[in-house]
């Protein structure tokens, strides 16, 4: 039968060993395991004793102890309490089934020789590898079980390569649980006594060394169904009580398994990092089952099973993320119009225009340089490209032709001055400059021109006090010498006949005000009567001046002197 089983054996082997690995007695419980088929990879060498015992108790479904939560098998559960504990444990892939149900399973009878095929759980998960062959494969002899284990290991290897678990998890489909026929035993009922899963697993594993290799694949399968049995599948216990025949009726609890699958995936992810160490002290919790099998079993087979389960879980998460790609496509669509839109074309056109303009700008100066074939600015002879030339005053000259306009000195590499469009050396240019009327030096910088002469600004000063006259009023005397206003009045202004002071303009004024009477000059303040000192008016009225014998008098004093 090993040859026809390969496909179905993949699922069957995954489920059956998970439950019956520690003790061959629980091998018939494979029916509930198919639901957990995503956990197939562990079939190669899962923890033989511990995992198998718990798997048998919680997952097998053959015996009444399997709780409804752990096993969503169609048959009604015989033991509700045990089912509940197993269901909680089954929720997480790594945790083994509840200890109560698991303890009875470890003492599984040798009748496990009848090894049911777990294809129905694969179909429930919706994995492509799930075999359609639900009928269990009875194996009454231990030797046949060994052969079946070998076939299961090969099938599990094929399943790991194909990764059917991802498809199963992603689909989320939970086919009705089909329990393969198995031989139930009274050991399953003492599930309450098996609350402590660790001791029972250890004892059965030690008692029966040969069934342990079979239990390794069973433990992995058992952990997987536990993830699903979050839905309380009481029919699992009934399936345990029922013989192999009722396993075919498992499809009824399919809806329960469907919710279990999603729960299992998150639990597995949580458990996968520290499954073997942490959950050991908590046998009732979902995390506990994985710890017990790891401690009881050799340990080498169980880690691969967990890793395989973890790998399966990762694909599940990826499948959940797959629906997200459409928004990414929408983003790409938005970007696509922005990137390849007309804006990019316009920018390209602008760049092309700029490059063309730059090329044209560069070509024009090159053309000018090409047109350098000009004639000399002095001799009008053409200039050869290889011949050195001097560019000055906007023209080109032969080196021998670029000379001073006056002394004919070559000016190449020297400072020169331009005067009326002709080059001059520094000496000749200085000779052409005007000289200051005061110091006689050529004026090379600023020049002040006054009275028809050129001066340095600092040389144009008053001839009396030498104060600078730039920007101020000045008066020139008869010798054409500049004077400041005060010095000029002091020297040339008329003097008052009374005070003998020069008559000067008042401060802030440029005009001079004076009174002339009897051929004499007076200040306004000095024009008054000589006898009484009364100010006289410049008007011809009674307050005016009444001269008498050369004296300036008022009318009253004039009358008094005239009577005498």
From Swiss-Prot:
The keyword Repeat is assigned to this record: yes
Sites of Asymmetric dimethylarginine modification: 244
Biased composition (Pro residues): 63-78, 93-109, 174-189, 197-214
CDD domains xref list: LIM2_Zyxin, LIM3_Zyxin
SUPFAM superfamilies the UniProt entry points to: Glucocorticoid receptor-like (DNA-binding domain)
Location of the region described as Disordered in the Swiss-Prot/TrEMBL record: 30-141, 162-344
One Pfam family here: LIM
Modified positions (N6-acetyllysine) in chain numbering: 256, 263, 270
GO CC, any one term: phagocytic vesicle
GO molecular function list: metal ion binding
Keyword NADP among UniProt keywords: no
Modification Phosphothreonine, positions: 180, 265
N-acetylalanine modified-residue sites: 2
Composition bias, Polar residues: 234-243, 294-310
Gene3D superfamilies, sorted: Cysteine Rich Protein
Chain ranges passing through the membrane: none
GO biological process: cell-matrix adhesion; cellular response to type II interferon; integrin-mediated signaling pathway; stress fiber assembly; transforming growth factor beta receptor signaling pathway
Location of the protein in the cell: Cytoplasm; Cytoplasm, Cytoskeleton; Cell junction, Focal adhesion; Nucleus
Keyword terms, alphabetized: Acetylation, Cell adhesion, Cell junction, Cytoplasm, Cytoskeleton, LIM domain, Metal-binding, Methylation, Nucleus, Phosphoprotein, Repeat, Zinc
Purpose: Adhesion plaque protein. Binds alpha-actinin and the CRP protein. Important for targeting TES and ENA/VASP family members to focal adhesions and for the formation of actin-rich structures. May be a component of a signal transduction pathway that mediates adhesion-stimulated changes in gene expression.
Name the record gives this protein: Zyxin
